[in-house]
Curated annotation (Swiss-Prot):
NCBIfam families: PRK02101.1-1, PRK02101.1-3. This is UPF0246 protein VP0504. One of its GO terms (cellular component) is cytosol. It comes from the Bacteria. Belongs to the UPF0246 family. One of its GO terms (biological process) is response to hydroperoxide. PANTHER family: PEROXIDE STRESS RESISTANCE PROTEIN YAAA (PTHR30283:SF4), PEROXIDE STRESS RESPONSE PROTEIN YAAA (PTHR30283).
Amino acid sequence: MLIVVSPAKTLDYESPLATEKFTQPELIEYSKELIDVCRKLTPADVASLMKVSDKIADLNVGRFQEWSETFTTENSRQAILAFKGDVYTGLEAETLSDADFEYAQKHLRMLSGLYGLLKPLDLMQPYRLEMGTKLANDKGSNLYQFWGNVITDKLNEAIAEQGDNVLINLASNEYFKAVKPKNLDAQVITPIFKDCKNGQYKVISFYAKKARGMMARYIIENRIESVADLTKFDTAGYYFVEEESTPTDLVFKREEQN
């Protein structure tokens, strides 16, 4: 079972590291091409392109300039510990054991606008470049065209290495659009998390993102190998709803949170 998740805009390069083990990202040549494009952008360009404040634009122009082809523990940290958005609040990677990290290294991948596909312990320099960014490049007008089949091919390598043909899609639509499911050597299973609000069950972004992280952790901690076992996910009050699910979409619900 291979899990894919989205990255996060919020980053943490300050907290103590939960592991000293690390690996090198495998698509740095592609990242370098994108950095070369990004280095030509002014702060005003970045603010407009990414729809961010001048302060965040300045920060990321600086990051593009400082980015190095050499990844060290001085300028980088492991991706799974650097990302700190809602998904990663649910994942709580900082409390995983060494054995969990080892398992995650084989069974978890993070999609990324700049790095393409990251293993949990891959070193990552700080950046902001969301997959949906309309960044013109030599391969097209956006990052989906830039990455083409590269991410899908890398996922197929990971699928082959980990032993079965099930991919659990815990990524957002923006990021999973960078994957070509028809070219994947796997069945794609997409969990859907619905929370009760005012008597109605619906996908609430904040809760759904956190639930994706919690499910990733559940798979890692429990070494889940089958979809049947995945339906037993019950973290934080979620429960599987068979009658609303299909073979490819697993619906989980939760009662209203106070």
